[in-house]
Amino acid sequence: MAAAAVAADSKIDGLRDAVAKLGEISENEKAGFISLVSRYLSGEAEQIEWSKIQTPTDEVVVPYDTLAPPPEDLDAMKALLDKLVVLKLNGGLGTTMGCTGPKSVIEVRNGFTFLDLIVIQIESLNKKYGCSVPLLLMNSFNTHDDTQKIVEKYSNSNIEIHTFNQSQYPRIVTEDFLPLPSKGQTGKDGWYPPGHGDVFPSLNNSGKLDTLLSQGKEYVFVANSDNLGAIVDIKILNHLIHNQNEYCMEVTPKTLADVKGGTLISYEGRVQLLEIAQVPDEHVDEFKSIEKFKIFNTNNLWVNLKAIKRLVDAEALKMEIIPNPKEVDGVKVLQLETAAGAAIRFFEKAIGINVPRSRFLPVKATSDLLLVQSDLYTLVDGYVIRNPARVKPSNPSIELGPEFKKVANFLARFKSIPSIVELDSLKVSGDVSFGSGVVLKGNVTIAAKAGVKLEIPDGAVLENKDINGPEDI
């Protein structure tokens, strides 16, 4: 054990010396990085004792339906909202969907991007209640320059938009535990953003946290910019202020699509996030069971700003470290990350709120884009609202082949988005394209044979069909 400690010390000393010479990042970033790596090397990650896990009670994970209605008085509503800040995590690129630049500028519906919809929502909120809810965007070094240009188009809106960067940390070369940028990798590939757990120190280091506190702001609503369901909810805000909860995680019931999502547990008297990576191998199936662990983290988080300041200043936010091994130009590297949801256990009176599924509508792939661009949803004041004509509570399951993976290819294969209000499942593979006015119902599978181009004609109605060629339509 002593030998391992010595090895860890020499690793950290070598890394510290090399990082000190990196001119691209601030002293705060260097200190944060070294602190993260030291925690990782000390192996302080505690194993969860499975027998100590308890299912949270309704006091800890509050059912949304039991929340008190917000005040009806407009002045009282304004007073509540004036304590709020909205923060969107804007560090991700649209590369997985074949787009360049920040993911938040992908067009979602009616020509509006994720960012457009967010701005329209907050504008209508500020106008309706006469309040001043600011929007913060946490960028990464990957999205910063593009985002700065993009937000200029909102300069005439009635909202204050602040941008700040999350930390930039060097990737570590696995072989000798030195930073990749100090070994000649001068481009962006030498660096990484260390996960959204970094939102708390970065908010503080940027000076934004002090500014917001001086303006009388009390809570920040943090959400992924690609979650179209993450809209301001006055009922939740009212509950947190009334009960002085320093932290709230929105959770929602698991479906079979969400079995890998983190869940909330009661553990040694505190509420905490349990991720699949922390689960001992022999309990993974139990973790995935919808019977025992019924809820998962939406990553919609509401956090008290004074509490963030207190905990960041005390360096108390020691979230579980997620090691993420990668390869850059054939070199094996390690990046260490943390998640914002894991911070829940450090805050006082932390709770979960079990919210309707409508508050979790992420767009991670073109199959999600098909859902939100279809007649399953409508757009009102920037809000994506579910069509009441859909009887089933769950959305249809949609699987699109690799031909649809990139947004440009996806759009080229649909003359118009089909009607899917009565669809249960859709599976498409091969060279398939859709005409306009197509209606899909029940369970539909469309598989074009290799080398065959399959076109679904205009106005086709497909109900419970298995299509392998034009003769099956």
Curated annotation (Swiss-Prot):
Statement: the UniProt record of this protein carries the keyword Nucleotidyltransferase: yes
Pfam families tied to this protein: UDPGP
Transmembrane helix listed as a keyword: no
Subcellular location: Cytoplasm
Substrates-to-products reaction catalysed: alpha-D-glucose 1-phosphate + UTP + H(+) = UDP-alpha-D-glucose + diphosphate
Species: Hordeum vulgare (Barley)
Binding site for UTP: 89-92, 103, 166, 195, 226, 364
Keyword annotations of the record: Cytoplasm, Nucleotidyltransferase, Transferase
Residues reported in the UniProt entry to bind substrate: 91-92, 196, 224-226
Molecular functions per Gene Ontology: UTP:glucose-1-phosphate uridylyltransferase activity
Protein name: UTP--glucose-1-phosphate uridylyltransferase
